[in-house]
């Protein structure tokens, strides 16, 4: 049983979908059951139950998904979740995923029913001291920093790895080896999500004593956003329009200088050259190409 929890808006459902998609490709003879919990509103008592909108990989005969409401406020899972999990166990699903609703800093209910727990967060958690308040960093087997394309994501990854090391007293290990991964669930074949999945399968195999081993050939590494227009060219069209505007301004300035020179030259013919001031300085203001055109 994998318990997936995290802050609201961290795209837990999207990341769950990416994990399910890879699992179905990796293990062609195994089945998956997903229970997705949505919060009930205190005012109306209703729940959206809209996590299936994010799931693109569940249209498969090996996948079962059910959305549930918490039926109570200030709770991340339903009181009936234990019975639901027992039913899925009886149905002999190979992998059961329980996704909670969004939690705060103190929500840890998922660890009571899950064999492996995953905490999903975003880089926008505030100051590094806020990490001290997140209970799930004490219990999570694996941590995903989703939306890794956000500004400051690399700093967030470093801070969370150090916090995980402190919380678990892994002082003899390098912080870079902590099970904390950056991911971009909205990006196809994201290398960070690939690495997260491979590590998750390894944790499941170790903790549950299963002979599961991934055979997928996946590109791994830090999550990197794939841009349609490279960041160093994002102002490319703007630069073109600015160049055109600057050229138009320059042309108008040169045209005014040429008009003035023409007027002075005509006046010189009428009243005589000795009656006019020296216009050589005025000619110097005209671009050589423009002088050549006039000549």
Q: Which residue ranges define each predicted feature?
A:
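Short glycine-rich or small-residue beta-strand-to-loop segments that form or flank ligand, phosphate
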Residues: 1-8, 64-69, 143-148, 181-183
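Walker A (P-loop) phosphate-binding motif
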Residues: 1-24
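Residue-level signature of catalytic and energy-coupling elements of molecular machines
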Residues: 3, 38, 81, 99, ...
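Nucleotide-state-sensitive switch-loop elements of NTP-binding domains
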Residues: 19-106, 110, 116-120
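Switch/connector loops and helix/strand junctions flanking conserved nucleotide-binding motifs
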Residues: 41-46, 73-76, 108, 127-128, ...
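Conserved Switch II/interswitch segment of TRAFAC-class P-loop GTPases
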Residues: 73, 94-95, 100-104, 113-131, ...
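Canonical P-loop GTPase G-domain recognition
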Residues: 134-214
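Extended helical scaffolds that flank P-loop GTPase cores
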Residues: 202, 206-295
